[in-house]
Regions:
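Class I S-adenosyl-L-methionine-dependent methyltransferase catalytic core
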Residues: 1-151
Length: 151
């Protein structure tokens, strides 16, 4: 999770998944643990239940991989894109993010190129990013900033 303080009332974590996965296959030296997905609200990023122009700031961090098993730790933790509909799904997600964003609001889009290059994903929105940053061990995680045009 990217939040410094999940309890901060300025943060709203929404996801279509919720649950806990026990991780028992780790060696005892690494400690056994659990992965948790505990959103504040449960809904689909393609159809958010918020009114237009509700937020000053939105972070869009969709699944980055197509067809990974939801029974795997990675699939449980990050979700999976459908191999047939991923482009439409991400396109709808971008549209929803900009719909709920106030004029001059910021959208931070997080993407990992493990499966799909960022350049392909950015074609799914007519909006143009303002700037971005690469991070991660292989520099394949991108943080991309958009600013919504004024109303």
């Amino acid at each position: 999770m990217m939040w410094f303080d999940k309890q901060d009332d300025r943060c709203l974590f929404a996801d279509c998944r919720e649950g806990v996965m026990e991780i028992n296959h780790l060696p005892a030296a690494q400690g056994r643990s659990a992965k948790k997905v505990q959103p504040d609200e449960i809904h689909d990023f393609r159809d958010m239940p918020y009114q237009n122009e509700s937020f000053h700031h939105v972070v869009y961090d969709p699944p980055h991989v197509r067809n990974i098993s939801m029974k795997s730790v990675t699939g449980f933790s990050y979700g999976s894109l459908d191999k047939e509909t991923w482009q439409d799904d991400l396109r709808l997600g971008f549209a929803e993010c900009f719909r709920v964003l106030k004029p001059h609001g910021t959208l931070i889009f997080k993407w990992n190129e493990v499966d799909i290059p960022l350049r392909e994903v950015l074609t799914l929105t007519p909006e143009k990013p303002l700037y971005g940053h690469r991070s991660g061990k292989k520099a394949n995680t991108h943080w991309v900033a958009f600013v919504k045009h004024g109303g």
